[in-house]
Amino acid sequence: MSSTENPDSVAAARELEALRAEASALRRQLAESPEQLREMESRVDSLSIRNTKLMDTLKEARQQLIALREEVDRLGQPPSGYGVLLGVHDDQTVDVFTSGRKMRLTCSPNVDAETLKLGQTVRLNEALTIVEAGNFERVGEISTLREVLDDGQRALVVGHADEERIVWLAEPLATVFEESERESVAYDAESPTRKLRPGDSLLVDTKAGYAFERIPKAEVEDLVLEEVPDVHYDDIGGLGRQIEQIRDAVELPFLHKDLFHEYELRPPKGVLLYGPPGCGKTLIAKAVANSLAKKIAEARGQDSKEAKSYFLNIKGPELLNKFVGETERHIRLIFQRAREKASEGTPVIVFFDEMDSIFRTRGSGVSSDVETTVVPQLLSEIDGVEGLENVIVIGASNREDMIDPAILRPGRLDVKIKIERPDAESAQDIFSKYLVETLPVHSDDLAEFGGDRTACIRVMIERVVDRMYAESEENRFLEVTYANGDKEVLYFKDFNSGAMIQNIVDRAKKYAIKSVLDTGAPGLRVQHLFDSIVDEFSENEDLPNTTNPDDWARISGKKGERIVYIRTLVTGKNASASRAIDTESNTGQYL
């Protein structure tokens, strides 16, 4: 430093330099402060997010602790008991059957004793207080109702081994329609709320002594078909006379009761339809039920679409049961069902198909004598103490000679109608039900009649019937030898039936479909029907019974002199040579 410099100026220069450095530092700090601020703000945001997550975690943990505490409390609760409500008292106490004991208990404040119903299931806590009302019991033993006692709250039922007991009726059973109410509502005999009748199956808790529910009889449901059949008289061909007979026997008494009463004429109790298989016996019975329902609906001023009648179609062979008395019990249940339906004023037809399988002549059984008790059961139902108002029995059989004579006498099955095999005129009528104008007809056949479809179908039917009923060599079926030595040639027309005619038409339709697939030419032809006739005849070659030709002939509708020998005479497409059928001395069972 120069000697001439002033010390004060030097100090001032240093101070100035220090101030400049401090100012520069302040400028740097001022420049860096926004970045620090942003960093601090970022840290604050991060801490806030962590704080929120920690709060959510704590809240979730608190909820889990509460749920676990509730689960621990629930698992630590003593078990609840159940009982059946027997009675409610004015002091809000109730009688309950629980654990094999009858106890008087109190209700929780959450349960209103006035809303409890007799027979209802209730839940009890550890202090034997009712804390909840449940439903009625759904499982138990099945017992048969013998009668409802005079108080209307109890019933006499029969359980296993004919053990009788008195039970209370739970509220669903105790609440029944009165006679006046049944007239004002649409009363259904199968409704769960209908009046109980002897023979009903009830769900019973024998320990609590309560009956809870009426159970439908499954065994009877399997044996009967309740419906208005969708079959009309117009659907049946070739049986005009027989249809008129059965209409006179069944419809007139229902539709004109006043005239029958005026002339003191008792309506028939039953009708027997007999004849060869496949000739329309079941169809007629169904058509009667349909027609009767519509006629009664019209007489009452109701819409025919609302027509109501009942057709109980009994599956005959299924009635037979290996256990003694079961068949008779089913017959009783069936007629009980018929009386229930008829009590509504609705006609009921009880139709026994294959009647000879159930009610054959007593003493004729080869390996069993079940008919000795089944036949009297039917007789007692038809003309027993309880009348069959609005109920008519229709039986069908192709072996009427095997039905017990007591069933066929007047006063039981009064009217007997034979369903004959169709003759040529009847066959044309039957063909017209299946060969209708809506079917496709081959153009060549239509061209023969100038495109007149009606004339073409009519002539087609005439040609087919002429082919079927011609006594020609190709139509010969059997040569039978009678016991007196006489011989007779039987033709296929002697064994024709409505079912066979339907089968022939179905075969022809199949031929027409195959023709379309092969040639592309659509339509039914007369030749298709001719081929179907040959096929049908050929398939029947082996049908004559080889064991007892006389029984087979009876079923087929050929009665008279006893047949001892049969020889087939089938010729034509795919037919085998004529052959003899040996008969055995020990005839055994037919078919």
Curated annotation (Swiss-Prot):
GO terms under biological process: modification-dependent protein catabolic process; proteasomal protein catabolic process
Pfam families: AAA, Prot_ATP_ID_OB_C, Prot_ATP_ID_OB_N
An annotated Gene Ontology molecular function: ATP hydrolysis activity
Gene transcribed to yield this protein: arc
Notes concerning its domains: Consists of three main regions, an N-terminal coiled-coil domain that binds to protein Pup and functions as a docking station, an interdomain involved in ARC hexamerization, and a C-terminal ATPase domain of the AAA type.
Keywords: ATP-binding, Chaperone, Coiled coil, Nucleotide-binding, Proteasome
Pathway where this protein functions: Protein degradation; proteasomal Pup-dependent pathway
Region entry Docks into pockets in the proteasome alpha-ring, spans: 590-591
Protein family membership: Belongs to the AAA ATPase family.
Stretch forming the signal peptide: none
Coiled coil: 8-77
Name under which the protein is recorded: Proteasome-associated ATPase
